[in-house]
UniProtKB/Swiss-Prot annotation:
Transmembrane segments: none
Pathway: Cofactor biosynthesis; ubiquinone biosynthesis
PANTHER family (alphabetical): METHYLTRANSFERASE, UBIQUINONE BIOSYNTHESIS O-METHYLTRANSFERASE, MITOCHONDRIAL
Binding-site list for S-adenosyl-L-methionine: 44, 63, 84, 128
Entry protein name: Ubiquinone biosynthesis O-methyltransferase
Record's function text: O-methyltransferase that catalyzes the 2 O-methylation steps in the ubiquinone biosynthetic pathway.
Pfam families: Methyltransf_23
One of the GO biological process terms: methylation
Enzyme class (EC, first level): transferase
Amino acid sequence: MPSSYDRVSKNYRQSELDKFAAFTSGWWDPHGPQKPLHALNPVRLDYISKRVSLSGARVLDVGCGGGLLSEALARQGAHVTAIDLAPELIKAARLHGLESGIQVDYRIQAIEDLLAEQPAPFDAIACMEMLEHVPDPAAIVDACAHLLKPGGRLFVSTINRTLAAFMLAVVGAEYVVRLLPKGTHQYKDFIRPAELAAWLRHAGLHLEDVSGMRYEPWRNRARLTARTDINYLACAISPEASHATE
């Protein structure tokens, strides 16, 4: 049966939505299928909060999943809109919000369709572990750029397309240690920092920073690193602010 969002943006793969929807029941379990994501979340939040004053800020979380980062941002005082195309995950996020008392505006919506509504621009947009799961990641970056206010920042995390990433993020994580279900990632969809930088430039954004992010399964913790050969975070700013500070 066609989904309700088949009428709107086509920049998704149904197989990807189904894959992550299967994790719904354990999304908020720190020892469940999303265990690595729980470890990454404090690092992602710290990276964002050091670059944006979150209290009172309008923040968009693109591909929010079950709401781990969305709630963390809202706890810092941000007014968070969180979008995802998996209805099961949005339902799980809303239910957890009822339990935690944290208010987030969760929507089953594609970013292209949010853009068409011409909402008030955002101070910050987070797009975490999402670009490698869509057919046209450059289009997502472009839509994000159009939704940022002058001086707003876009935060992205993804996986580099390197041999090290294939061996650790695919072979190691999915087949050896089994931290993730088999088929979670496709190597061909990984994104090199230079590719991301080109998309950001084309969208009119200025790349401020690229930092490596490393997950240590034996300690179940994550940290920033100078190495960007596997996971990495990036921050880009709208051109008005970058020009004003030159």
